[in-house]
Amino acid sequence: MAPPPPHIAVVAFPFSSHAAVLFSFARALAAAAPAGTSLSFLTTADNAAQLRKAGALPGNLRFVEVPDGVPPGETSCLSPPRRMDLFMAAAEAGGVRVGLEAACASAGGARVSCVVGDAFVWTADAASAAGAPWVAVWTAASCALLAHLRTDALRRDVGDQAASRADELLVAHAGLGGYRVRDLPDGVVSGDFNYVISLLVHRQAQRLPKAATAVALNTFPGLDPPDLIAALAAELPNCLPLGPYHLLPGAEPTADTNEAPADPHGCLAWLDRRPARSVAYVSFGTNATARPDELQELAAGLEASGAPFLWSLRGVVAAAPRGFLERAPGLVVPWAPQVGVLRHAAVGAFVTHAGWASVMEGVSSGVPMACRPFFGDQTMNARSVASVWGFGTAFDGPMTRGAVANAVATLLRGEDGERMRAKAQELQAMVGKAFEPDGGCRKNFDEFVEIVCRV
């Protein structure tokens, strides 16, 4: 009797860019899986509603809701951090197991044959309880993953001297020699080690090498230093570079399927009227938010640069200098189709929070960056951009108008900017090669599909 077709459950962490990145990954997996394979994408109801806006689902991919932990009647008044805490508590209490049971029911009783998802412990626990292998998808940078895997060793080394040794390079830790103590993610050697996120990430790093059947990395061959990749490969099973995930075949909606992403504010048409490489694109993602006084400095710096800019900013520029929107040669919108914007010929610079999804979108578009990290692994990503790879610059602390004007002018018109652009385009070419039919990422993805579709 033939075995049943694979039923893959993809479990999302429904905050920041995690779910969107994993959703792109799930779309690619749905496109590549053998005929008869079904996929259930587990996330909260609110997150599913947002992801549905990206376009129609492939026929073999469905949403399955998991508990968000939000008490009835409190939905409208909760802050994002509070929502995250409630979700994690629900997940720890068995929310993902409930989701896997719902996935089985929605698939006509077909048992889940593999669990794919963010590298969080509750996903591993739920997979174990369901008797299914767990395959982890790391959505952040490889350097951040190595830092989390080495947390105990780093804490023993740095001790309570994180502040006094902030500028010291981590040369004693293989794969991390290009990074300083200050670049490490929050909760590794500084910050509140008992904060729920710090504890969670520490636990997942301890569990990952033992529990995961394979680990997908959001990077491509040649991007990370060889000693970093070697260090990861020594600790993780089937460590497969597959990124940027949004470039996997089938990951993005396409115009020929009438699923092209919307551009409700006319960003691309506005860019069409600008000269090549003349525009600075500014976006700090969905969760990073600068203080009002820093936003004012950013606005003043953009105006002082004299360059046209496209600024994706939720809400209004209440803190901007008086008359800014009337005087400055820019467009401010609450949302922009970022991948399409970065690919546009008019965009010559990217001012970013250095979230990993944004960094990878910038790399794959060949656009040099000016990084203003805020939290998490963003400082490490900014260090990678500015020092390890050299295709951008990083602000030293909060943005000032002078620093913004100088960064934009450098990236768009300066000699250093030309060097950074050349490096960005070199990396872009490497990305393209990795995703050719016989490229490293395509071959690794074929191996990944084979692993998750075993039944």
UniProtKB/Swiss-Prot annotation:
Leading EC class: transferase
Pathway: Pigment biosynthesis; anthocyanin biosynthesis
InterPro entries per UniProt: UDP-glycosyltransf_plant, UDP_glucos_trans, UDP_glycos_trans_CS
Gene Ontology terms, MF aspect: anthocyanidin 3-O-glucosyltransferase activity
SUPFAM superfamilies cross-referenced by the UniProt entry: UDP-Glycosyltransferase/glycogen phosphorylase
Active site: 18 (proton acceptor), 118 (charge relay)
PANTHER family noted in UniProt: ANTHOCYANIDIN 3-O-GLUCOSYLTRANSFERASE, GLYCOSYLTRANSFERASE
Name by which UniProt lists this protein: Anthocyanidin 3-O-glucosyltransferase
Species annotation: Hordeum vulgare (Barley)
